[in-house]
């Protein structure tokens, strides 16, 4: 039984999917870095739509981690962990941190 051709196709598909996931994670990182900078550069009230985007992205990344069991690098894992809580006081806390120059939730 020659299983190599099918196995090779699966490996090639796996490689392509992994590369696509890594590219998408990099895009998430770039968007999050931009959001963090924008949040830190504006007042708290004007930052609310930006926070909405940031917490939406955190939720999507948490789905990747917990539902699909894809373990990203430490930086993304830290973001998922630290931005798990989305409420007024959490937003105040992160707004102050980002305004003080923190570039990534840690």
Curated annotation (Swiss-Prot):
CDD domains: CdiI_NC101 (cd21060). This is Immunity protein CdiI. Signal peptide: none annotated. It comes from the Bacteria. It comes from Escherichia coli (strain NC101). Forms a contact-dependent growth inhibition complex of CdiA-CT-NC101, CdiI-NC101 and EF-Tu; the complex is a dimer of heterotrimers. Immunity protein component of a toxin-immunity protein module, which functions as a cellular contact-dependent growth inhibition (CDI) system. CDI modules allow bacteria to communicate with and inhibit the growth of closely related neighboring bacteria in a contact-dependent fashion. Neutralizes the toxic activity of cognate toxin CdiA-NC101 (the C-terminal 154 residue CT fragment). Does not inhibit toxic activity of CdiA from other toxin-immunity modules or strains of E.coli. InterPro entries: CdiI-like.
